[in-house]
Amino acid sequence: MADYLISGGTGYVPEDGLTAQQLFASADGLTYNDFLILPGFIDFIADEVDLTSALTRKITLKTPLISSPMDTVTEADMAIAMALMGGIGFIHHNCTPEFQANEVRKVKKFEQGFITDPVVLSPSHTVGDVLEAKMRHGFSGIPITETGTMGSKLVGIVTSRDIDFLAEKDHTTLLSEVMTPRIELVVAPAGVTLKEANEILQRSKKGKLPIVNDCDELVAIIARTDLKKNRDYPLASKDSQKQLLCGAAVGTREDDKYRLDLLTQAGVDVIVLDSSQGNSVYQIAMVHYIKQKYPHLQVIGGNVVTAAQAKNLIDAGVDGLRVGMGCGSICITQEVMACGRPQGTAVYKVAEYARRFGVPIIADGGIQTVGHVVKALALGASTVMMGSLLAATTEAPGEYFFSDGVRLKKYRGMGSLDAMEKSSSSQKRYFSEGDKVKIAQGVSGSIQDKGSIQKFVPYLIAGIQHGCQDIGARSLSVLRSMMYSGELKFEKRTMSAQIEGGVHGLHSYEKRLY
């Protein structure tokens, strides 16, 4: 027998890799590219991996993905798409309070069970009023009541079929002349269950099902499009009223309290306090204010990168923490301010501390690939916030433009001079609203068209599931348990190892991800 072979069976297994505690015991700060996770044992298929994870103390998502509150990433279209696929979007606040509240309202109205506050018109309104409502809200199936309000007697309904072929000169036509009259409508009685109402809607083959009381007064409405959305998006993030979940960002100054009032009136589910450095007297005071005035509202504090920063916000009463400082692709905070922390270390250190108090953390920034998402979750993050990864998608705000034959969309940091010049909200985020000289902490750029997140996010979800499968974790909660117990093992990567782990040795190649 060769002298290098060991006889006696395979019971002996040498210790291999580092625990997370050992990995981050050194004084060096680590980013996601600085380490790998060692594989485990596979005894399940990737589709079985449960990605359910906590956003805050009281809000749980079926997909651990969040869109960042940036003005080139998240408005209503992005927030709707993210919620439909099990995540959530945070509407940016680099705009007027009224605009932001209206974007939240669009998300909350997008998909519902019983719609109790639909757009309602009267017979004396015109076709032009319907077209205006369609342009503003994106739908045209509008119930008609005697007074044009909920709780009034139902007299008909106007759908696109009633007005599609009317000429522009007919836009002044009264709805009483074009509406489908009450006698031809299929309705359901008040008190009907959502399941029963859905069955009636399916049998009737109508687009809308009005719900009326004993006096034939309109009390709610159900839309066929919502049935289709329920079928197509089983993971959708919804509140107790079956409305899509929506978050929004606010600042920490006195005038942000008015913005907060409008957002709560619009039905926002969770607030993120948007600051580049969250460990401040301003943010602590705002947390106290929100918890006193709106105790039901979930509040996410941040941004933080140390346990000491996290402690002050947890003591103030936050329900979640946003972790990251200077690690975003468009952020130059570390370069300009000399403050920040490598994101891998920041996520691990803050998550390890915050979990003792039941506070979930969001890994915000530095996410370039689906592998980075898996690493962030393996270090203790409950969810991952994405900016550049979602920028230049169809759902991101802004118009496409061409440069050198490439289709692009603008993407900028909220600390860029571009963003600061648009609104004072960006200046407040970086504590510079009173400065005579503005110090940029971000840049403006452009990103190549990525298409719709309807294709991109499913790719991310599948990638996370396959990553967990290779690790041997059936769920994200199991993944975190493996990390904290020491079962999950890591290994540092040299620069040569990073080169080896990427594409190399080819004359040319095409990198198609999905």
Curated annotation (Swiss-Prot):
IMP binds at residues 329, 364-366, 387-388, 411-415, 441. It is found in: Cytoplasm; Nucleus. Its EC number is 1.1.1.205. One of its GO terms (cellular component) is nucleus. It catalyses: IMP + NAD(+) + H2O = XMP + NADH + H(+). K(+) binds at residues 326, 328, 331, 500-502. Changing residue 198 to K: In LCA11; does not alter the enzymatic affinity of the corresponding enzyme; alters the affinity and/or the specificity of single-stranded nucleic acid. The active site is at residues 331, 429. GO terms for biological process: 'de novo' XMP biosynthetic process; GMP biosynthetic process; GTP biosynthetic process; lymphocyte proliferation. Pathway: Purine metabolism; XMP biosynthesis via de novo pathway; XMP from IMP: step 1/1. Its main location: cytoplasm. Mycophenolic acid (MPA) is a non-competitive inhibitor that prevents formation of the closed enzyme conformation by binding to the same site as the amobile flap. In contrast, mizoribine monophosphate (MZP) is a competitive inhibitor that induces the closed conformation. MPA is a potent inhibitor of mammalian IMPDHs but a poor inhibitor of the bacterial enzymes. MZP is a more potent inhibitor of bacterial IMPDH. Subject to product inhibition by XMP and NADH. Also inhibited by ADP. It is linked to Retinitis pigmentosa 10: A retinal dystrophy belonging to the group of pigmentary retinopathies. Retinitis pigmentosa is characterized by retinal pigment deposits visible on fundus examination and primary loss of rod photoreceptor cells followed by secondary loss of cone photoreceptors. Patients typically have night vision blindness and loss of midperipheral visual field. As their condition progresses, they lose their far peripheral visual field and eventually central vision as well. Leber congenital amaurosis 11: A severe dystrophy of the retina, typically becoming evident in the first years of life. Visual function is usually poor and often accompanied by nystagmus, sluggish or near-absent pupillary responses, photophobia, high hyperopia and keratoconus. Catalyzes the conversion of inosine 5'-phosphate (IMP) to xanthosine 5'-phosphate (XMP), the first committed and rate-limiting step in the de novo synthesis of guanine nucleotides, and therefore plays an important role in the regulation of cell growth. Could also have a single-stranded nucleic acid-binding activity and could play a role in RNA and/or DNA metabolism. It may also have a role in the development of malignancy and the growth progression of some tumors. This is Inosine-5'-monophosphate dehydrogenase 1. The gene is IMPDH1.
